Amino acid sequence: MTIKPAVRISDGNLIIKNRTILTGVPDNVITTSASEAGPVEGVFVGAVFNKEESKHIVPIGTLRNSRFMSCFRFKLWWMAQRMGEMGRDIPYETQFLLVESNDGSHLESDGANGVECNQKVYTVFLPLIEGSFRSCLQGNVNDEVELCLESGDVDTKRSSFTHSLYIHAGTDPFQTITDAIRTVKLHLNSFRQRHEKKLPGIVDYFGWCTWDAFYQEVTQEGVEAGLKSLAAGGTPPKFVIIDDGWQSVERDATVEAGDEKKESPIFRLTGIKENEKFKKKDDPNVGIKNIVKIAKEKHGLKYVYVWHAITGYWGGVRPGEEYGSVMKYPNMSKGVVENDPTWKTDVMTLQGLGLVSPKKVYKFYNELHSYLADAGVDGVKVDVQCVLETLGGGLGGRVELTRQFHQALDSSVAKNFPDNGCIACMSHNTDALYCSKQAAVIRASDDFYPRDPVSHTIHIASVAYNSVFLGEFMQPDWDMFHSVHPAAEYHASARAISGGPLYVSDSPGKHNFELLRKLVLPDGSILRARLPGRPTRDCLFADPARDGVSLLKIWNMNKYTGVLGVYNCQGAAWSSTERKNIFHQTKTDSLTGSIRGRDVHSISEASTDPTTWNGDCAVYSQSRGELIVMPYNVSLPVSLKIREHEIFTVSPISHLVDGVSFAPIGLVNMYNSGGAIEGLRYEAEKMKVVMEVKGCGKFGSYSSVKPKRCVVESNEIAFEYDSSSGLVTFELDKMPIENKRFHLIQVEL
């Protein structure tokens, strides 16, 4: 008996677990088994060409009538999602493609009797780095999927490729993606996955960023004002990001063009130290160290981060300085310009960047970071990263230049910021992702734009779908937001279930503390979910921004509960014809969908004992304050208008003895209620539940019977019991005592 590979090319077809995904695969497309990485279900794909070139495009087969979700770069810096069923629907600059088989069910099998052939098969396409070439996918009018390979340097050429694309398949989409990235990691040996990296401490605390509050006009006084006003409302920030505006920069001399001046000259970095705004007034020799000291000693911050571009500043480092900077002019790949034509007239394109010599880039980063570290700074937000791919001409190409800069950056961060203090930003190209060994946090989408009404639903959809891919490399950061804003709750609830950093960019004195207290505990800590927030399995191929019928559901996990967010993101999306985000008409203002307990993909991991859980869940609606018992596979309808949301805590119900059952919910006034539960133990013989709970506020749980008593530490406390729903609530009126992290709670049934 011959066992056929799960992924193979046969008779011109790409066969995935005996299902045809692509037809008409050309003869010059070749495959290599991934078996060297272990018993994996995937193949590497390459192609052979007649001539050495710096760019090649080859069709790898025709895709028709199979649903897909792609992550593509609609801007140089950022990805967004695009769904379709035909090859022609695949955008330029697609860096991740997930295809669903036409047959089978998307529901996971019910236990050991589930048969794989009855389930959907999910195929992951990962365009890779091979040597000095980077690849991406795109579709053409004939529904062919094309593999585009380019070096970004006319002198860096090649004619033969064997490992430019990896294809992997499985029946669990999330595990399939993780396994695919792991196989690529073992092959490339140039990056690490998220779970292998140290997460910086900022992810577990509330923070503030100066950007939308001050933009480039930020000052020391402004920083202190923001910290002070947030703390005054009982939500003290524990980290701050001093964004663009602290560095020493100057414009080039104005260039005359006849009687008219050209566009205003771009700013370039003139030195690694702070500008005059961040020098101490009575002692100019004391620079940014002054505000760092004030932030930590006076306002109790744990972490201070500052912003810089990967090239130093937007216009790079001014040539003639000590780091060998020379002028380079961005050369965009065709796919980027097709998706974002504004690059043709962008100030960077026209005026260029001062690029630090690759031989001196470690010196540049190390001197900058060591200066900041000596001042007490704990980390950096490194922006403008994708620009490196445009500057590789004459330097070995885009991949080589990106690799050199990122190796230097990683080394400097590891040396100077022991908490691994680095946020990668404007960094969605695979050139960087596939060489990232250090950075553990990455901005997940284009910016939060407080003054752009079209952006808000788009933002939530983008961060969720981008996290499917980006979350394998780093913890996605869903960006800052404003707590006083028409979409404040919409954004805030999403940040609460994102699993990433949680921070606002409010102007000093402009805060909604009622909202912030749903996110932040009195000590400045947050209830962070454990994974990247991602769309539920049944939403992966829906189009909740465009199709007019779908709600977006986002799932995440805590230790002992799951969390599920539902969002109406319809009404706006990136337009492939206008090449920008636009509003579009919807048939109805309100949509109805449904949720199930098992929408939380890993909910079984929240059960302390599989023998006491039959799949039933207690589901708590945060906005309505309602508790519902949902049997396995039973669904609950949810109706939302555009830009409305709902958050549900999902908790496995443990069935104990004598028909008694229990499930913890958490701090019910917080968006991610279940994130408060740090310990859970059932003592069935004593009919007792023991929990360790962080924070303070109203605590809730489900019990099929009225508890005999509830004890916090050693004190019996009053509680309320709703016999119709089984909701038990009581007050934790203060934070745990100073030397303890948790409240010890016992519920006797």
UniProtKB/Swiss-Prot annotation:
Induction: By oxidative stress and by dark treatment. Down-regulated by sucrose, but not by osmotic treatment. The gene is RFS6. Keywords: Carbohydrate metabolism, Glycosyltransferase, Transferase. Its EC number is 2.4.1.82. Transglycosidase operating by a ping-pong reaction mechanism. Involved in the synthesis of raffinose, a major soluble carbohydrate in seeds, roots and tubers. Pfam families: Raffinose_syn. Gene3D superfamilies: Aldolase class I. This is Probable galactinol--sucrose galactosyltransferase 6. InterPro entries: Aldolase_TIM, Glycoside_hydrolase_SF, Glycosyl_hydrolases_36. It is an enzyme of class 2 (transferase). GO terms for molecular function: galactinol-sucrose galactosyltransferase activity. Belongs to the glycosyl hydrolases 36 family. Signal peptide: none annotated. The keyword Transferase applies. It catalyses: alpha-D-galactosyl-(1->3)-1D-myo-inositol + sucrose = raffinose + myo-inositol. The keyword Metal-binding does not apply.
